[in-house]
Amino acid sequence: MDDLPLNVGLPIIGVMLVLIVAILCYLAYHWHDTFKLVRMFLSYRWLIRCCELYGEYERRFADLSSLGLGAVRRESDRRYRFSERPDEILVRWEEVSSQCSYASSRITDRRAGSSSSSSVHVANQRNSVPPPDMAVTAPLTDVDLLKPVTGSATQFTTVAMVHYHQEYT
């Protein structure tokens, strides 16, 4: 059997190399998540945990719109944006112990000369969205948002930081 001609074999090799490089770049960029997936795969309950974690992730993403700041668009695993505002939510997913206590949300006034901060529950932010010169750091403390998936051995805390930007003229 003759070898493939050069004009057929070269594009195939090129496509394979591009795919391999793309996979390696993805793994390098998401090394932390990849490491977690490898550890989960090596555990004996990897399939059950994978389903639980996916369900938890999707449910929490759906609940982000309950902040009352408009529709939310997912840009990556950790970055979300509101469709009608220039605000952004950064979400940190991390395992927490059962003894963990959840702090209430904080609104911090970032105006010049002001250092005041007040505690606000996320549920109350629906009707009291701060003006554009305020910066919000809001750990989601709603009971539904922090409730783990039924039967899940892992809990997650979702931390949402909403940044308000205003150009001064």
From Swiss-Prot:
Functional description taken from the UniProt entry:
Plays an important role in the establishment of latent viral infection. Modulates the expression of several host cell surface receptors such as TNFR1, CD36 or the MRP1 transporter during productive infection. For instance, associates with host MRP1 and induces its lysosomal degradation. Plays an inhibitory role in the host cGAS/STING/TBK1 pathway and upstream of IRF3 phosphorylation and NF-kappa-B leading to inhibition of interferon beta production during both lytic and latent infections.
Gene Ontology molecular function: any one: molecular adaptor activity
Using the UniProt record, give the first listed, main subcellular location: host cell
Listed under subunit, the entry gives:
Interacts with host TNFR1. Interacts with host MRP1. Interacts with host UAF1/WDR48. Interacts with host STING1.
Q: Which organism is it from?
A: Human cytomegalovirus (strain Merlin)
Q: Where is this region: Disordered?
A: 109-133
* Gene Ontology biological-process entries: positive regulation of receptor signaling pathway via JAK-STAT
Q: Which gene encodes it?
A: UL138
- Any stretches that span the bilayer, and where are they? 8-28
The lineage's top-level taxon is: Viruses
Localization, UniProt: Host Golgi apparatus membrane
Q: What cellular component terms from Gene Ontology apply here?
A: host cell Golgi membrane; membrane
Protein name, entry field: Protein UL138
